[in-house]
Each structure stands twice: as C-alpha cells, then as structure tokens.
Swiss-Prot record:
Biased composition (Low complexity): 527-539
Protein name as annotated: Transducer protein Htr7
GO molecular function, one term: transmembrane signaling receptor activity
Domain Methyl-accepting transducer, chain residue ranges per copy: 236-476
Ranges for region Disordered: 111-157, 521-545
Modification Glutamate methyl ester (Glu) occurs at: E281
Xref: SUPFAM superfamilies: Methyl-accepting chemotaxis protein (MCP) signaling domain (SSF58104)
Gene that specifies this protein: htr7
Species classification: Archaea, Methanobacteriati, Methanobacteriota, Stenosarchaea group, Halobacteria
UniProt signal peptide: none
Top-level taxonomic group: Archaea
Residues of the HAMP domain: 164-217
Length: 545
C-alpha cells in the first residue's frame, strides 16, 4: 500500500468521519431546535433530526469499524445505517416543497404583519402629531383659562365691591326710612358714591324726605296759625259776650226808668216803637252777623285751600315714594343680572371641568403610548380642574352675596311701602280736615243766606214801621227816643249775644279740629320743629343734612 493510501486511511478518512459525525450531530441539534422553536411543520424537522442521528450513528460505526473495533458487527451495521440515513433524508426531501410553501406562507404572514406594524407605526405617528396638536390646543386653552381666571378675579373683585356698596347703601337707606317712619324727617342718606344707580336711589330718597319735611312744615305752620286765630277769636267772642251781657243789664235798668212814659204811650207808640226798633236792630245785627259769617267763610275757604295744597304735597310725596320703590326694584333687577353673571361663571367652570376631563383622557392616552406628554397633560388637567373648582367656589360666594343683597332690597321695599301707607293715612286725615272745612263753609254760607233774607225782610218792615212811628212822633218825642234806644240796645245785645254764642261754638269746633291736625303733624320731626312729642333730636351720624 502506498504512503498516500496509508495517509488517507490513517488521517483523512478518520478526519472526514469525525467531521461528518460532528456535522450530523450539529444537524441533529439544529433540527431539534427548529422542531421546538419554528412555526414550520414538526414532522419535517422530526425526520431531519432522526436522519441526522442516523448519520451520526453510521459515521461512528464506520469509524469504529475502521479502528478494528467489532469489525464484523459494524461491517454488517454500516450498510443498513447508511441506507436508512439516505432513505430518511430522501423522505425528508420529499417534504421540502410543502415546507417551502409553509415558509412562503410564513414569510407572507410576516410581511403582512410587518405592513400592519408599519401602518400601526404610521397611525402612531399620526396620533403623535394629533397629540402634539392637542397639546398646543391645551396650551392655548390653558392660556385662555388663565386669562379667564384673571378676568374672573377682577370681575369678582368688582362684584364684591358692588355688593359691599349695595349692602352699606341698603343698610343706610333702611335706617333712614325707619327713622322717617318713626317721624324723624331730618334723616338723610349719604349720596356720595361712585355707583350712579346707588347715588340716584340716595338722591331720590333725600328729595322725597326733603319734600315731606317742607310739606309738614307748611302744614304745621298753617295749623298753628289756624289754632292761634281760633283761640284769639274765641277769646274775643267771649269778651264781646260779656260786654253784651253788661249792656243788656244797663238797658234793662234804663227801661225800668221809662216805664211810666211807655205806659202813657202804650196804646200807640209803645208797640210800634218797639216793633220798629226791633226790626231796625235785627236788620243791623243780621247785617253784622252776615259780615262776620262772610269773613268766617273766607277763613274757612282759605283753610280748605291750604289743606288741599297739603294733600297735593302729600300726593307728590307719594309719587316720590313710588319712584323710590321703582328705583329699588331696578336695583333688584341689577342684582338679578349679577346673579346671571355668576351663573355664567359657574357654566364656564363646568366647561373648564370638562376640559380638565378631556385633558386627563388625553394624558392617559399619551401615557399608554410611552410618550413624555402624559405627565404634561396631567399637570395641565390638574391646573384646569383647580381653576374650575376655584371659579365654582367664587360663583357660589357671589350667589350668596347676591341673595343677601336681594333680601335686604326686599326689606327696604317693604319699609318704603310701610312709610307710604303712613303717608296715605296722613293724607286721609288731611282729606277729613278738608271735608270738615267744606262742611263749615257750607253751614256758614247757609247761615249768611238766611241772615241776608232776614235783613231784607227787616228792612221792609222797618220802612213800614217808620211811617207808623212818624204819626205818633210828635206825641212823645223824649219818651219815644228813650224807650226806643233802651229797647233797641236790649234787643241788639240779646241778638248779638246769641250770634256770638253761635260763632264761639263754631270757633271752638274749628280750634279742636286744628288741635287734632297739629297733634298729628307733631308726630313728625323736621329741621323747623326740632323735636316730635318732646323727644331728643339726636339722629344717627351721617343721616341728617
């Protein structure tokens, strides 16, 4: 045997067998791994692994045979092992086409999955861009919310200031009207304020009180004048009545001294003289009473006109109070508009809450995508939610303040209406006085008409009596003159006393009515009167001009 053959048998063949054994072993390991890990059919990899193991067995048998170990046994085994290995590889080869198809399907599936992954990546990119847009929108809305927050704070400060002014003004108006309802017309509302509506309300209330004060002063002055004049007239009438009584007594004494003379002329002159004198004196007295009644009518007419002027002034006060009620109602409408603004702020807060909820949802989406925008969205959402909570709290506080202002405004309106009712009562009392003056005027006019008729009748009778008396004048001039004067003075004194009694009664009734009017007017306190019912004139600070 040549050296080359020996080298081949000694080195190359064993080395090739070793390489083959190692290769079959590696193929078996690879086939088993693919059988376990790959998605291809398991039967192919099972056959591949089995064939590789047979190849390892065949190679080892061949190596042992060449090494002289159990030569006869391995000589018999190597041939079948080789045939089996080739057969198994052949069988595995027939399944290669199916495996290739499966691999192609697997490749297509992976390509489809890769395409889906690309689409998902593109979708994720679009979602990222959309998230960035939403983030920009959120930042813009955050800026707008911050601006709205600042505006809300400024508006809240303005509303708080307005509410404070309204509360202070309502309190002052209430105190002033309460003082006026108690009779103190010197109280005034401070009209120095920056709010035009509040200043207008204060001005209207002050004008109303000034008008009422001026009217009450005028009525009080008129009442005082009427009372004084009535008392003076009553006193004068009393003096005249006493003087008339004295004159009547003197005349009776004179008449007693002329009885003898009247007895001599009793058949002719006595009755005629007495009749004529009585008629003349009655006519004169009737004219005097008519003049007095005319003067009294003028006084009563003037009193009635003054009382009617007082009613007109009270009507003006009532119109002013109605205007004040309308202004307070307008103030209540203004608080209603402020309440609408508070509701608008509450609605903005609710919308801001919805914005915070959307921001939280976007933050959750951004966080699930693994991006860093989730935390930013969460922070923005928390800030927006805090802003919404603060806005709702401010809106609630404003609503409570408005409710309190509306309650105080309603109380003020009620107090003004009570004062208006009291003014109505005063107007009714003055109207009763006017009616009383009217009745007095009518009675005096009727008395004047009756006295005028009596005076005319007496004038006619006096003319007839003078013609009769002239026929007996020459008989007893001195006696007739004395008797006539005595009888005339006596009759005149009696008639004058009766007339003065009636006038005194009328003056006393007028004085009583004037006292009643003055008592009612004294319930009010003005700058001119100073006090009402003798009370102190101390008024709350800032409530009087």
């Amino acid at each position: 045997m040549s050296g080359a053959a020996v080298f081949v048998d000694a080195v190359v063949a064993p080395l090739g067998d070793a390489v083959g054994a190692i290769g079959f072993g590696a193929a078996a390991a690879l086939g088993y791994r693919n059988y376990r890990d790959t998605d291809a059919e398991a039967a192919f990899w099972m056959a591949f692994t089995f064939a590789s193991l047979l190849g390892v067995t065949w190679t080892v048998s061949l190596m042992l045979e060449k090494a002289g170990v159990a030569t006869q046994i391995f000589n018999l085994a190597t041939g079948p092992l080789m045939a089996t290995t080739v057969a198994v590889f052949a069988i595995g080869g027939t399944a290669t086409l199916a495996i290739v198809e499966d691999m192609e399907a697997l490749v297509e599936e992976r390509a489809q999955r890769r395409q889906e992954a690309e689409e998902e990546r593109a979708e994720a990119e679009r979602a990222r861009e959309k998230a960035e847009q939403k983030q920009a929108e959120a930042e813009r809305q955050t800026a707008e919310a911050e601006s709205a927050k600042q505006d809300a704070r400024e508006r809240s400060a303005e509303i708080e200031q307005l509410a404070a002014d309204l509360e202070s003004q309502a309190t002052e108006v209430g105190a002033t009207l309460e003082a006026a309802s108690d009779g103190d017309l010197t109280a005034r509302v401070d009209a120095t304020t920056d709010n035009a509506e509040i200043a207008e309300v204060a001005t209207v209330v002050n004008d109303m009180l000034t008008t009422m004060e001026r009217t009450i002063d005028e009525i009080q002055g008129f009442s005082t004048n009427v009372t004084t004049a009535s008392r003076e007239a009553t006193a004068g009438a009393k003096e005249i009545q006493d003087a008339s009584q004295t004159v009547s007594e003197s005349v009776q004494e004179i008449a007693a001294g002329t009885d003898d003379q009247r007895e001599q002329l009793e058949s002719v002159a006595e009755e005629m003289d007495s009749y004529s004198a009585t008629v003349e004196e009655v006519a004169a007295t009737a004219q005097s009473v008519a003049d007095t009644a005319a003067d009294t009518t003028d006084v009563a007419t003037a009193g009635k006109q003054t009382a009617e002027d007082a009613i007109d002034a009270i009507d003006a006060v009532q119109e002013t109070m109605q205007t004040t009620v309308a202004n307070v109602d307008a103030l209540e409408d203004l608080t209603t508009e402020i309440d609408d603004i508070a509701e608008l702020i509450s609605d903005i807060a609710e919308q801001t809450n919805m914005l915070a909820l959307n921001a939280n949802i976007e933050a959750a989406r951004a966080g699930s995508g693994g991006g860093s925008n989730g935390d930013g969205f969460a922070v923005v959402a928390d800030e927006v939610k805090e802003l919404a909570t603060e806005s709702q709290r401010s809106a609630k506080d404003i609503a409570e303040l408005i409710e309190e202002v509306q309650s105080q405004t309603a109380t003020t309106v009620e107090e003004i209406r009570v004062a208006e009712q009291r003014v109505n009562d005063g107007a009714a009392a003055v109207e009763e006085t006017v009616d009383a003056f009217g009745a007095v005027t009518e009675n005096i006019q009727e008395t004047t008409d009756g006295v005028q008729e009596i005076s005319q009748a007496m004038d006619e009778q006096a003319q007839r009596s003078e013609r009769v008396v002239s026929s007996v004048d020459d008989i007893a001039t001195i006696s007739q003159a004395t008797a006539d004067r005595a009888e005339n003075v006596s009759a005149a004194s009696e008639e004058q006393t009766a007339s003065i009694t009636e006038v005194t009664s009328s003056l006393q009734s007028l004085a009583a009515q004037a006292d009643t009017l003055e008592d009612r007017l004294n319930e009010f306190r003005t700058e001119a009167t100073g006090t009402a019912h003798g009370e102190a004139t101390d008024a709350p600070a800032g409530q009087s001009d």
